[in-house]
Curated annotation (Swiss-Prot):
Keywords for the protein's UniProt record, in alphabetical order: Amino-acid biosynthesis, Cytoplasm, Diaminopimelate biosynthesis, Lysine biosynthesis, NAD, NADP, Oxidoreductase
Name used for this protein in its record: 4-hydroxy-tetrahydrodipicolinate reductase
Keyword NADP: yes
Any one of the GO CC terms: cytosol
Organism: Lactobacillus helveticus (strain DPC 4571)
HAMAP family: DapB
Function: Catalyzes the conversion of 4-hydroxy-tetrahydrodipicolinate (HTPA) to tetrahydrodipicolinate.
Annotated family: Belongs to the DapB family.
Pathway: Amino-acid biosynthesis; L-lysine biosynthesis via DAP pathway; (S)-tetrahydrodipicolinate from L-aspartate: step 4/4
Length: 261
């Protein structure tokens, strides 16, 4: 008889958290056993959690051996401590929260290896975003002049998006060292956007948007634009489902959905 896999959802009150709760509720062999939120009321059914699910307001309340998986859609301020806690308690994290530094991610990878606990941090769970990054990395071999525009909803806490930063890192790995317009002068501070190893990143925050990204390449007499659009948060759930099904095959923390596909 197959054992039911137990899932804790951190940030279950948010839009992505609710999508994750709905996903797990409809997955065979998985069950939401708990939620973590500092502001939730102790009424799990109000948040579409099973009636038996426990709601915790902080990490210190969570008992040992509660869950097998930890889905995290919280905030940039909370995510590092959340994932650290999960790894220390041998709960496999599936993390969609962005905003951690490279140093924090590196520390968590070291911890996961020490504890021999697999997990995933994904800047984006959408398949279109994963493919955009893959295609952009390939194009960078031939078009070193490139800029990134990412557009998200007005409530997004971090900028640039984790997807845009991950895209820039992948491009930088595959691109000759290059600085576009090295002699430019800004007459309005930061008008040219953020800079990652010579790659300009522009962040747009507006109502009505969900998650969108364009990578613009320019060359002599030609241009290439790669774009992806997420029109509904439900589009990310296929990636979360894949992660839940695969992370128990890992013995360390992995960055990027593309690395488990």
């Amino acid at each position: 008889m197959k054992m039911t896999k137990k899932v804790l959802v951190a940030g279950f009150m948010g839009a992505m958290g609710q999508k994750a709760v709905n996903l797990v509720n409809n997955m065979s062999g998985f069950e939401v056993v708990a939620g973590l939120s500092p502001i939730a009321e102790d009424n799990p059914e109000q948040y579409h959690l099973p009636a038996s699910a426990k709601i915790f307001k902080n990490l210190t309340e969570i008992p040992d051996n509660l869950a097998d998986f930890w889905i995290d859609f919280t905030t940039p301020k909370a995510v590092y401590e959340n994932v650290k806690f999960a790894l220390q308690h041998h709960i496999r994290p599936v993390v969609g929260t962005t905003g951690m530094s490279d140093e924090q991610e590196a520390e968590l990878i070291v911890l996961s290896k020490k504890e021999k606990v697999g997990g995933l941090i994904a800047p984006n769970f959408g398949m279109s975003a994963v493919l955009l990054m893959k295609f952009a990395k390939e194009a960078a071999k031939y078009f070193p002049d490139v800029e990134i525009i990412e557009m998200h909803h007005a409530d997004k806490k971090d900028a640039p998006s984790g997807t845009a930063l991950a895209t820039a890192k992948m491009i930088a790995e595959n691109r000759p060292e290059h600085q576009t317009a090295p002699d430019e002068v800004e007459t309005l501070k930061n008008v040219r956007g953020g800079d990652y190893q010579g790659i300009k990143i522009h962040s747009v925050r507006l109502p009505c948007y969900i998650a969108h990204e364009q990578v613009l390449f320019g060359g002599p007499g030609e241009a290439l634009t790669i774009r992806q659009d997420s029109f509904d948060r439900g589009s990310f759930m296929n990636g979360v489902k894949v992660a839940l099904e695969k992370v128990d095959q890992l013995d360390e923390l992995v960055i990027g959905l593309e690395n488990i596909l």
